UniProtKB/Swiss-Prot annotation:
Keywords: Cell membrane, Membrane, Transmembrane, Transmembrane helix. It is a multi-pass membrane protein. The keyword Amino-acid biosynthesis does not apply. GO terms for cellular component: plasma membrane. The lineage of its organism: Bacteria, Pseudomonadati, Pseudomonadota, Alphaproteobacteria, Rickettsiales. Its main location: membrane. It is found in: Cell membrane. InterPro entries: NA-bd_OB-fold. It comes from the Bacteria. This is Uncharacterized protein RP252. The chain crosses the membrane at residues 7-27, 51-71.
Amino acid sequence: MFMINNYLNEIWLIIGIICILVECYIVQNMGFLFLGLGALSNSLFVYNKPLVIFTLTNQITFFGLFSLVWFCILYYPLKKYVYNKTDKTKSYSDMIGKTVEVYSPTVSSNTIGQVKWSGAIMNAYLAPNEIDAKIGEQLFIIGVKGNILICSKHRFNNNADYC
């Protein structure tokens, strides 16, 4: 036990580095990041104040508190960074230019009809000044407005906003 107490600072440092590496390269769920930062903070605290928290129980308590503090400080900024990688208005950009098949009897520019895209039946209407499309015809997706596809009989090369 005496040998472990002499190297607790280095052990906390190694635990912190391992947790951060696991977060970066293996798990990537933000949990190990907070534990790693808590262990590194605990290592720094043990190095500077060895007599205050000499027992292992106190060090584990401080490790938990440091991890909680790092969680409170970094959770919301990291949550915004991780989950807001794409703009919500551009989230359907992979659909633009794809082909759909008319599923309802007709689809026109002033009434919503249904089209089949990638096996899913979706609501759609035609772009302004388009001739009505009949069942079975092929259309191209030129835009998305909410959960409704905007389609055209002609493929457009640019991603102009037709909404």
